[in-house]
């Protein structure tokens, strides 16, 4: 079985693929100081609840936007799975995607992995929205090349900034308000962040489509993207497994077959 690890700024996703489908997924808060042994204790307990063990894992693929976390994740794979991990972005790791940026090295590992995951399922030109610590909009050409995109603050980051910078504004949960106009501080903050982000998404997608001047499919993924379901007019597909599907594609491109 393949263990795919997607290490983001806020959360790290561990997912197991049995050769046919994803059979387990777990999230933990990203902590670059967590040792390989600490990862192993946590992961072994969760796998044990499903009747699985480390002996089931024969391969590992890792993508991280937190360089400090890589050392311990690599050691987790080496020490406990006896597998040399495929690590996105390292020399010699194939991605098979043309990057049409002025500085191709600026393309983040997570964004390229998302592009591969989307290309495996969707045809034609694409806009991929990934809502995490940052909200990214990535344009994938009809020929599969990474054209560029937009990086905006994430919805959680915006809510935290309101609370942190304004002394009288409380910490509130992100939620879809029943109405746009708030009747108290909490609902006003929720409305500003939620509907502000919906208009950010819909407005930027419209601008990208106008600039690109051809039909495009819009795919959304990320930890909070389910909140937008039914609210955004621009999103065509919500795809929770987009990133780990991309990691599976990376594994296949680099010799992976029987997981």
Curated annotation (Swiss-Prot):
GO cellular component: cytoplasm
Binding site for substrate: 108-111, 185
Enzyme Commission numbers on file: 2.7.1.33
Residue positions of the active site: 110 (proton acceptor)
Location in the cell: Cytoplasm
Amino acids binding ATP: 6-13, 133
Catalysis performed (reactions): (R)-pantothenate + ATP = (R)-4'-phosphopantothenate + ADP + H(+)
Species assigned in the record: Maricaulis maris (strain MCS10) (Caulobacter maris)
Protein name from the UniProt record: Type III pantothenate kinase
Entry-linked Gene3D superfamilies: 3.30.420.40
Enzyme class: transferase
A single BP term in Gene Ontology: coenzyme A biosynthetic process
Cofactor note: A monovalent cation. Ammonium or potassium.
Cofactors, names only: NH4(+); K(+)
Complexes and interactors: Homodimer.
InterPro entries listed in its UniProt record: ATPase_NBD, Type_III_PanK
TM spans (from-to): none
Record: residues binding K(+): 130
Similarity annotation: Belongs to the type III pantothenate kinase family.
Pfam families on file: Pan_kinase
């Amino acid at each position: 079985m393949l263990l795919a690890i997607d290490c983001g700024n806020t959360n790290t996703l561990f997912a197991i693929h049995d050769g046919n489908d994803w059979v387990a997924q777990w999230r933990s808060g990203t902590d670059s100081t967590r040792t390989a042994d600490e990862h192993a204790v946590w992961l072994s307990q969760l796998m044990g609840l499903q009747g699985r063990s480390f002996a089931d894992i024969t391969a590992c693929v890792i993508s991280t936007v937190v360089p400090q976390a890589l050392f311990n994740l690599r050691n987790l794979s080496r020490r406990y799975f006896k597998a040399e991990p495929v690590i996105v972005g390292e020399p010699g790791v194939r991605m098979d995607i043309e990057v049409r940026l002025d500085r191709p090295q600026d393309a983040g590992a997570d964004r390229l992995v998302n592009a591969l995951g989307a290309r495996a399922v969707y045809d034609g030109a694409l806009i991929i929205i990934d809502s995490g610590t940052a909200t990214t909009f990535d344009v994938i050409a009809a020929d599969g090349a990474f054209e560029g995109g937009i990086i905006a603050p994430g919805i959680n980051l915006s809510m935290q900034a309101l609370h942190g910078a304004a002394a009288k504004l409380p910490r509130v949960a992100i939620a879809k308000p029943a109405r746009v106009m708030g009747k108290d501080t909490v609902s006003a903050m929720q409305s500003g962040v939620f509907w502000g982000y919906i208009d950010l998404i819909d407005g930027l997608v419209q601008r990208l489509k106008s600039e690109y001047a051809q039909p495009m499919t819009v795919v959304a993924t990320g930890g909070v993207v389910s909140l937008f379901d039914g609210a955004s007019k621009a999103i065509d597909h919500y795809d929770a497994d987009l990133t780990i599907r991309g990691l599976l594609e990376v594994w296949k491109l680099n010799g992976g077959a029987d997981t």
